[in-house]
Regions:
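NAD(P)+-binding Rossmann beta1-loop-alpha1 motif at the extreme N-terminus of oxidoreductases
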Residues: 1-57, 123
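Rossmann-like NAD(P)(H) cofactor-binding subdomain of soluble oxidoreductases
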Residues: 36-38, 46-49, 55-60, 64-128
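Short loop segments at secondary-structure junctions
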Residues: 130-132
Length: 132
């Protein structure tokens, strides 16, 4: 599995740390350079992480894309990006609903997830809202 994270804040980094503490089979993780210091820390910690400077490149190279940006940033950048229909999208964006995400991305293969920071230590719930 190849994951791509658009947005590299607390929740995205907690998910990444949790992934590497788990037994998930991850081939590669691409992350955005938006939070440069955190992105560098993640890439130095794990050899399977690569920082990319272009969000479209993250989408193109990943099989599963996680949207971990604020609602304001999401509304600004998502309409400029192209998502193919075969990509799986997991939105961590709190206030952009599924219908709007489907319209913006032209992709129906989207779920919303609300992980909490304890995911980093493989604890705590993840609320998932499926596409239907």
């Amino acid at each position: 599995m190849i994951l791509g994270f658009i947005g590299t804040g607390k929740i995205s980094s907690s998910i990444i740390f949790g992934i590497f503490k788990s037994k998930l089979k991850i081939k590669r993780i691409y992350i955005s350079s938006r939070n440069r210091n955190l992105a560098k820390k993640l890439s130095k910690s794990y050899g399977k992480i690569k920082i990319l400077n272009n969000n479209q490149e993250i989408i193109d190279k990943s099989s599963v894309i996680l949207l971990g940006v604020t609602p304001n940033v999401g509304n600004k950048i998502l309409p400029k990006l192209r998502f193919s229909k075969n990509k799986k999208i997991i939105s961590l964006i709190s206030t952009i609903n599924l219908n709007k995400l489907k319209k913006i991305t032209k992709n129906n293969n989207i779920v919303r997830a609300i992980p909490l920071p304890p995911i980093e230590i493989k604890k705590g719930p993840i609320i998932v809202c499926p596409p239907e």
